Swiss-Prot record:
Belongs to the universal ribosomal protein uL30 family. It comes from Dehalococcoides mccartyi (strain ATCC BAA-2100 / JCM 16839 / KCTC 5957 / BAV1). The keyword Ribonucleoprotein applies. This is Large ribosomal subunit protein uL30. Part of the 50S ribosomal subunit. Keywords: Ribonucleoprotein, Ribosomal protein. One of its GO terms (cellular component) is cytosolic large ribosomal subunit. InterPro entries: Ribo_uL30_ferredoxin-like_sf, Ribosomal_uL30_bac-type, Ribosomal_uL30_ferredoxin-like. The gene is rpmD. GO terms for molecular function: structural constituent of ribosome. HAMAP family: Ribosomal_uL30_B. SUPFAM superfamilies: Ribosomal protein L30p/L7e. Disulfide bonds: none annotated. One of its GO terms (biological process) is translation.
Length: 60
């Protein structure tokens, strides 16, 4: 399965609680942290919800 690298680049302060919960569900603990996740439809849906807070890269 393909992998994607997600980097959290913008704080959740001032945004809705569910967006902060989505950031935590993706596995982030600190700002500017990167995580590698499987490229699945569930992960893609979470990324769409917080697309203004993260940067996405494909891992080969």
């Amino acid at each position: 399965m393909a992998k994607i690298k997600i980097t959290w680049v913008k704080s959740t302060i001032g945004y809705k609680f569910d967006q902060a919960a989505t950031i935590k569900a993706l596995g982030f603990k600190k700002l500017n942290q990167s995580v590698i996740q499987d490229d699945s439809s569930a992960i893609r849906g979470m990324i769409l919800k917080v697309r203004h807070l993260v940067v996405l890269e494909e891992v080969i």
